[in-house]
Regions:
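Short acidic/histidine-rich active-site segments
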Residues: 138-157
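Sec-exported extracytoplasmic/periplasmic mature domains
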Residues: 80-84, 135-138
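A short helix->loop->beta-strand "cap" motif at the edges of active sites that frequently abuts
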Residues: 7-8, 136-140
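A metal-dependent hydrolase metal-coordination microenvironment
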Residues: 1-83, 89, 96-98, 103-105, ...
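Active-site-proximal structural scaffolding
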Residues: 103, 123-126, 135, 156, ...
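Aromatic- and carboxylate-lined catalytic core of secreted/periplasmic carbohydrate-active enzymes
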Residues: 167-173
Length: 173
């Protein structure tokens, strides 16, 4: 990528969504997962190839009821099949129940701090689900993010990811 340097690295990624509405189009809950382009090995093992620049992934839309756990599994499988490192985003803001996303080994990181949703609705910080998963013996990392939308309130430079890596390369990060 043309902006990469010894001090800065761009990791391509995408966000996919699934939304559950009631019968009158009222929002009930949703899943948001990020797929960050994985290591060379993950890319080589991508069953479905890699996502293309600006490729749009249509959201999954359901009405009335859904099997939220199955939806999460399908979304994660889609990202994994495209060579991605996977994060599950802002579960409190999304109004999901723990059984819908607390699935061992399905994603790499759980977002425990989302600066945008902290400012928007006070629902962006929560370590309870992560702690619950760890107590169940699940192995999942945690992350913090800005989720920058440049909307009606400040949502940048409040959450960030720090990585202890040997070097600033895609595979090491």
């Amino acid at each position: 990528y043309k902006y990469n340097s010894d001090l800065f690295l761009i990791l391509p990624g995408t966000e996919i969504a699934a939304v559950l509405f009631d019968e009158k189009d009222g929002y009930l809950k949703m899943h948001h997962l990020n797929g960050i382009l994985g290591t060379k090995a993950m890319q080589e093992q991508a069953k479905s190839g890699l996502f293309q620049h600006m490729e749009r992934i249509e959201p999954i839309v359901a009405y009335g009821d859904w099997d939220g756990r199955k939806v999460t599994e399908e979304m994660a499988e889609n990202l994994r099949d495209h060579g991605c490192f996977i994060t599950y985003n802002h579960p409190v803001w999304s109004r999901v129940e723990s059984h819908e996303f607390e699935i061992d080994g399905i994603y790499d990181s759980l977002e425990i701090y989302n600066y945008n949703t902290v400012n928007e609705s006070g629902t962006g910080f929560n370590t309870t689900y992560w702690d619950e998963m760890l107590r169940k013996g699940m192995h999942v990392n945690a992350d913090a993010a800005d989720d920058n939308h440049n909307g009606n309130f400040p949502d940048n430079f409040g959450g960030y990811v720090m990585v202890a890596a040997e070097s600033l390369t895609h595979d090491n990060i």
